[in-house]
Amino acid sequence: KGILQFDMWGYEEKELMHEWKNLKNMIKKYGVRNSLLVALMPTASTSQILGNNECFEFFTSNIYTRNTLAGDFPIINKQMVTDLLDIGEWNTETKDLIIAGNGSIQHITSVPTIFKRLYQTQWELKQIWVLKAAKARGPFIDQTQSMNVFMEEPNDQKLNSCLFWGWENGLKSGLYY
């Protein structure tokens, strides 16, 4: 039929970045093997070994220590370090302030606001943005995406709000475990 995942979300080709008509015509003619290809899952161990963040998650902390059976490994947000180096703000004092702030840079007065906004941790970010990012990815994920929301003071109202927002906006699964 030439129907792709984003078609089932009600998107029209003119709203998308690329032209899909030729691919859809080829699918109509030849079909698709392994048609369910995209499922975004947590990649904790692999990402930490490679010095990346987990899948599409926001950083839970800009600096922390990963404890494993093989030893303890420091995890540092490389992009943040690069940006702070570029403006002359990455040094031992800044590193120590981030560690003292549980991985946050929000309290460091010498860090420009643009970087404070860019490098908010998962705990500092309004969770509606996490949900909106999941919705934006949804039309291009044919299986599912495994994501987390972080609440310092969770309650029934906050949790229900997140779950219902996801359901109302077409996210495929509300809970697992």
Pin down the residues of each PLM region.
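Catalytic alpha/beta core of large soluble enzyme barrels
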Residues: 13-17, 26-177
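Short glycine-cluster motifs
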Residues: 1-26
